[in-house]
Design a protein with these regions (language model features):
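Structured catalytic/nucleic-acid-binding cores of DNA maintenance enzymes
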Residues: 1-248
Length: 248
């Protein structure tokens, strides 16, 4: 599932088409382009150019030169492709075509991505890679749900998925079942530093799957730091691995 690093890679793809005039739009997939009717996005975007790109957590959007904003979400398995041949089996769910040739496509085999005009991100928490110290303390250090579930809540901070949550907690030496409102300030600050470091490393190395813990998230896996057998459970509805010796 795409997490913040994959979304940042997609934003950089989107950046490649800034300044190119849109001459055609394929918005026929009524599920991916909901709530827009077929042709509505095309009518709003044709003749405009993307002028800037942004990301908050897993959510992407682009400004246009006088037209509406364009919001994109990769869903569970989507990606953005630029100037590639059309995908087989109609997996290109939303497509922009540009003057002089070339195309941007939301490619999504599972059809869980989104394309929408003028997206509303008021329900989305601050970007996990950029949230400040005081705001992180106030948002994450609340509530009694397991700490991992708190990190996964996109209204609290945005961009942390299942793999990154395990990696962040392992780096911070905090157990996934810890109660957020019982963490002290030093623990919350350590968690924020671990979050930012894990995000930076994952963006640099190419995705959430590159974390130190991730290759060991298997049955029988051992902690790469102390070699203790990892524990495995479902926490917050997600499969979770952690070190019972390091993560307290």
């Amino acid at each position: 599932m795409p997490e913040l690093p994959e979304a940042e890679r997609a934003r950089r793809q989107l950046e490649r088409v800034v300044g190119r005039e849109i001459v055609a739009v394929d918005d026929a997939d009524t599920y991916v382009c909901r709530p827009h009717a077929p042709g509505e996005m095309a009518a709003a975007l044709v003749g405009h150019r993307l002028s800037d790109t942004h990301r908050r957590g897993k959510f992407l959007w682009a400004e246009t030169d006088g037209g509406p904003g364009l919001g994109l979400h990769l869903g569970m398995a989507g990606s953005l492709t630029v100037d590639e041949e059309p995908a087989p089996r109609n997996w290109d769910r939303f497509v922009l075509e540009f003057d002089g040739g070339g195309r941007l496509a939301l490619r999504d085999k599972r059809r869980l991505g989104r394309a929408v005009l003028d997206p509303d991100f008021s329900h989305v928490g601050p970007d996990a890679a950029e949230v400040g110290r005081e705001e992180f303390r106030a948002r994450v250090g609340r509530g009694t749900a397991p700490l991992k579930a708190r990190l996964l809540d996109q209204t609290v901070i945005s961009g942390v998925g299942n793999l990154l949550a395990d990696e962040i907690l392992w780096r911070a030496r905090l157990g996934p079942r810890r109660v957020p409102n019982q963490l002290d300030t030093a623990e919350l600050d350590r968690l924020r530093r671990s979050t930012r470091a894990a995000m930076r490393d994952a963006i640099r190395l190419g995705g959430a799957h590159t974390g130190h813990l991730i290759p060991h998230r298997v049955r029988g896996g051992r902690c790469p730091r102390c070699r203790t057998a990892l524990e495995r459970a479902t926490i917050g509805g997600r499969t979770t691995f952690w070190c019972p010796a390091c993560q307290l």
